[in-house]
Amino acid sequence: MQEVASASTHELTSQGLHEFKRLLIQARTEQSAIETELITAQKAERQAVQTYDRWRNGWLFKRVRKQRFQQLQEAAQLTTDVRAELEEQQSQARLSTQIEMPDAARSAFLRMSDAFAALKNASRIWDTVQERSTNRVAERTMAHRTVMRKPVRFDLGRCEVIEADWQAPHLGNANGGDLYLYPGFILYFVSTDAFSLLDLSEVEITYDPVRFHETEAVPTDSKTVDRTWAKVNKDGSPDRRFKDNYEIPVVLYGQLSLRSTTGMREEYLVSNAEAAEEFVAAWAAFIKAARSGE
């Protein structure tokens, strides 16, 4: 079978977004270094404050050893100041992502997010990870294509490499990086060290209705549109030579395909075909509004 997957993160990033990616990596590197120092500083602060508090709450030592008590107080304050300074540095190291959009584009993006919110509630969503063409005669089937699929989740969320105020549509990926749909770009995220940024103009998201021969339980939000058999004749009738031949429901699913000129290739099956179609229509409306600049 042939894998259905995107190219590596080194290849996917759009030409015009390489500098933005570099800044994100730089900011993340600085944050990681500060986080390491901050953990050490927080531990030192806890120890210093606990020691000072024991002396302060006691009666004898702070009166008998006044100089030592003063030193403990100063040490506790110093560790608190160091921790606060590192937290400030951590905040400043974050690269805030603010994308200015015309009112029409912003409204279209919000409508697309609403459509995605409905899509994510589909009973089942699968990532198509492998495919092959069927030999319809040898396999005695009416299906043109055989796929391997794995269940994934869609949700609205945030990715740790992007500092933004909004939640972006998030598409899980069973054999590659997760996808986040932001107003100005698509983020393909494997890890904080491996991610790509794709310009919206280079990505195409399409919808196709798929008649799927479902051998598992039929999702509650799907429509059964036909019936077939495990083994069939050329005319679609059941092949009576097979004693244990059984009936298979043909279910209407929505197929989402994401392609880019830089090598993105992702494909999903959604049990709620109507929600999938409405999402892609809302996405197309957003792209049109974003390109018009109105």
At which residue positions do the language-model features occur?
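A composition-biased, non-transmembrane "mature-region" signal
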Residues: 1-294
